[in-house]
């Protein structure tokens, strides 16, 4: 694309080359604008019509967009302008928009970007099943999805996701408290074969039935977060140890019904567990209470 003509506002020295005189697609876009933070691009586009056209051309070719690069808060109008022409996004993160992001804001972006592989919508509580339906229907290559703290995610929404996202590998459902065992069981049966990372943290509705079904259907599962899942017990953990050979990390803090014997088999395999063994806990307590730090070997 040739740079549009723009009045210089003054005489140009003979032989001098302005920034905008450089080839846009061969030099400016890949080697200069690709290194400029989004926040600075918003300022740059105000300089002139030519700079605005250059920035818009760059934005149209974005493969990754993280709203956090703009700032902790981003106005609706700014997001709409930044993503107006983007049609090749592969990664999209919109957590800073959580206070106002609606279906009307998000669905057109999803529709224009069917190549999306990673989407982060953590805390976006104004969305609904419609947005998740558009994502599942329009982005068949989706691999990673964060819906943490999205209270609107229910069993029906998760079923639609499980039915239409064959490439799904990583799913964050932290604090999606409407989800119950039945929804997780369905997810495991439909998409378990490809799941590698799953968070069900802070959901008191999730119990052993869901964990056992995940274990039996997710042979490639590497990371599972069950923090605060109060109904999960030792039976679920034992099933994980039996059926999940690829498991690398397990989070069970505040799962008060999970006993050490069910965790010991995973510890022997080197699985990273966020709860210390009872002996270690006792020694730390002894150290704290009696001041025996110089005398207690915590590596017993």
From Swiss-Prot:
It is found in: Cytoplasm. One of its GO terms (biological process) is SCF-dependent proteasomal ubiquitin-dependent protein catabolic process. Gene3D superfamilies: Ribonuclease Inhibitor (3.80.10.10). It comes from the Eukaryota. SMART domains: LRR_CC (SM00367). The keyword Cytoplasm applies. It holds the Pfam family LRR_6. Residues 113-269 are annotated as: Interaction with SMURF1. One of its GO terms (cellular component) is SCF ubiquitin ligase complex. Pathway: Protein modification; protein ubiquitination. The modification N-acetylmethionine is found at residue 1. Its main location: cytoplasm. Transmembrane segments: none annotated. SUPFAM superfamilies: F-box domain, RNI-like. The keyword Nucleotidyltransferase does not apply. Keywords: Acetylation, Cytoplasm, Leucine-rich repeat, Repeat, Ubl conjugation pathway. LRR repeats lie at residues 141-162, 167-188, 194-215, 220-241, 246-267. Residues 19-66 form the F-box domain. Belongs to the FBXL15 family. Substrate recognition component of a SCF (SKP1-CUL1-F-box protein) E3 ubiquitin-protein ligase complex which mediates the ubiquitination and subsequent proteasomal degradation of SMURF1, thereby acting as a positive regulator of the BMP signaling pathway. Required for dorsal/ventral pattern formation and bone mass maintenance. Also mediates ubiquitination of SMURF2 and WWP2. Part of the SCF (SKP1-CUL1-F-box) E3 ubiquitin-protein ligase complex SCF(FBXL15) composed of CUL1, SKP1, RBX1 and FBXL15. This is F-box/LRR-repeat protein 15. It comes from Canis lupus familiaris. The gene is FBXL15.
């Amino acid at each position: 694309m040739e740079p549009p003509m723009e009045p210089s506002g003054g005489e140009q020295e003979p032989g001098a080359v302005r920034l905008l005189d450089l080839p846009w697609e061969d030099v400016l876009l890949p080697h200069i604008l690709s290194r400029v933070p989004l926040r600075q691009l918003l300022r740059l586009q105000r300089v002139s019509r030519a700079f605005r056209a250059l920035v818009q051309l760059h934005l149209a070719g974005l493969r990754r967009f993280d709203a956090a690069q703009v700032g902790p808060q981003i106005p609706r109008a700014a997001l709409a302008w930044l993503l107006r022409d983007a049609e090749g996004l592969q990664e999209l993160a919109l957590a800073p928009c959580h206070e106002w992001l609606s279906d009307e804001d998000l669905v057109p972006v999803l529709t224009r970007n069917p190549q999306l592989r990673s989407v982060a919508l953590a805390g976006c509580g104004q969305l609904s099943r419609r947005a998740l339906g558009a994502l599942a229907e329009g982005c068949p290559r989706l691999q990673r999805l964060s819906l943490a703290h999205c209270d609107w995610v229910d069993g029906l929404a998760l079923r639609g996701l499980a039915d239409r996202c064959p490439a799904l590998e990583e799913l964050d459902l932290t604090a999606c408290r409407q989800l119950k065992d039945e929804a997780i069981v369905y997810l495991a049966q439909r998409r378990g074969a490809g799941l590698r990372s799953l968070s069900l943290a802070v959901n008191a509705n999730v119990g052993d039935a869901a964990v056992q079904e995940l274990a039996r259907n997710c042979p490639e599962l590497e990371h599972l977060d069950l923090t605060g899942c109060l109904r999960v017990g030792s039976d679920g953990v034992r099933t994980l140890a039996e059926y999940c050979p690829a498991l690398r990390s397990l989070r069970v803090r505040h799962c008060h019904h999970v006993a050490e014997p069910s965790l010991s088999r995973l510890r022997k395999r080197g699985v990273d567990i966020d709860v210390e063994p009872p002996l270690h806990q006792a020694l730390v307590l002894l150290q704290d209470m009696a001041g025996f730090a110089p005398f207690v070997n915590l590596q017993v």
